Amino acid sequence: MPKLGMQSIRRRQLIDATLEAINEVGMHDATIAQIARRAGVSTGIISHYFRDKNGLLEATMRDITSQLRDAVLNRLHALPQGSAELRLQAIVGGNFDETQVSSAAMKAWLAFWASSMHQPMLYRLQQVSSRRLLSNLVSEFRRELPRQQAQEAGYGLAALIDGLWLRAALSGKALDKPLAHSLTRHFITQHLPTD
């Protein structure tokens, strides 16, 4: 009989092991055997919890996207009466949270983005994440701008966030957070009306 609470512990171990494997060898070369070995479990445990490698990869993607959602929401909840500018900066901060810019997370995101073009479930997850970012940004810009301008500003800031993140991921270096925050803050202030 399985121990109570073991399922969540095992799932976490396997997701963490998957991120480590992707970080070291890439998604396509990360095998079930390697992941199981890193997690200290048998390959049968992966089949038990996730069916197969695709199920494990999907769970890993869901985990990363939920960490992103939580990073953004935690910052927004801390600013319930905050200005649009502060709340936009909070959304940016969530996207540049350590859970999203660690080497393992960046490599996993790149692998998932590439795979999402060919795997419908990963595509849906990627689309949900992209739409959520754009919706959050437009909603905050909408507090200060007409609809069309808010949509354009939201799209531009989303592109800037993704571009800064992608340049860092492809450089193999850590994201320069002060620079990223400075550039996004400048974009935000350029697009919001001045009093």
Curated annotation (Swiss-Prot):
Pathway entry: Amine and polyamine biosynthesis; betaine biosynthesis via choline pathway [regulation]
BP terms from Gene Ontology: glycine betaine biosynthetic process from choline; negative regulation of DNA-templated transcription
InterPro entries given in the database record: BetI_C (IPR039538), DNA-bd_HTH_TetR-type_CS (IPR023772), Homeodomain-like_sf (IPR009057), HTH-type_TetR-like_transc_reg (IPR050109), HTH_TetR (IPR001647), Tet_transcr_reg_TetR-rel_C_sf (IPR036271), Tscrpt_rep_BetI (IPR017757)
DNA-binding region: 31-50
Keyword Nucleus: no
Domain HTH tetR-type: residue ranges: 8-68
Pfam families: TetR_C_6, TetR_N
One term of GO molecular function: DNA-binding transcription factor activity
Annotated keywords: DNA-binding, Repressor, Transcription, Transcription regulation
Main function: Repressor involved in the biosynthesis of the osmoprotectant glycine betaine. It represses transcription of the choline transporter BetT and the genes of BetAB involved in the synthesis of glycine betaine.
UniProt name for this protein: HTH-type transcriptional regulator BetI
Source organism of the structure: Escherichia coli O45:K1 (strain S88 / ExPEC)
GN (gene name): betI
